[in-house]
């Protein structure tokens, strides 16, 4: 089964992709040319460049941020209660239909 993920960019333009379970939200975005998700550290949770907002309907389903992830997010001026690092959310069948809001890249 493929998992559908919808990415909504900072201009409110949405794009839905289908990917195999087991990849991160960040890796799925990067391999499908989704703009506004950077990957400075390659997805190892050391940079916060892949900061996204999880749609409120999906926050409980995506789990909670680890201590390391929370530490990186605490340095972000744009942090919200639904902020996550997209490299730390692994897609599964339970997340089929997930909606992610991306941030405009910093200059």
Swiss-Prot record:
Per UniProt, where does [2Fe-2S] cluster bind? Answer: 41, 47, 50, 87
**Which key words are in the record?**
2Fe-2S, Electron transport, Iron, Iron-sulfur, Metal-binding, Transport
Enumerate the Gene3D superfamilies for this protein.
Answer: 3.10.20.30
* InterPro entries in the record: 2Fe-2S_ferredoxin-like_sf, 2Fe-2S_ferredoxin-type, Adrenodoxin-like, Beta-grasp_dom_sf
CDD domains the UniProt entry points to? fer2 (cd00207)
Metal-binding as UniProt keyword: yes
- Occurrences of domain 2Fe-2S ferredoxin-type (ranges): 3-106
- Pfam families reported for this sequence: Fer2
User: Could you tell me what induces this protein?
Assistant: By the monoterpene alpha-phellandrene, but not by acetate.
Q: How is the cofactor bound, as the UniProt entry phrases it?
A: Binds 1 2Fe-2S cluster.
Names of the cofactor(s):
[2Fe-2S] cluster
Q: Which GO terms describe its biological process?
A: P450-containing electron transport chain
Question: Which Gene Ontology MF annotations are present?
Answer: 2 iron, 2 sulfur cluster binding; electron transfer activity; metal ion binding
Its pathway?
Answer: Terpene metabolism; monoterpene degradation
Knockout-associated phenotype:
Mutant cannot not grow aerobically or anaerobically on limonene, but it can grow on perillyl alcohol or on acetate.
Q: What does this protein do?
A: Involved in the degradation of the cyclic monoterpene limonene. Probably part of an electron transfer system involved in the oxidation of limonene to perillyl alcohol.
Family of this protein: Belongs to the adrenodoxin/putidaredoxin family.
Task: Quote the protein name from its UniProt record.
Answer: 2Fe-2S ferredoxin CtmE
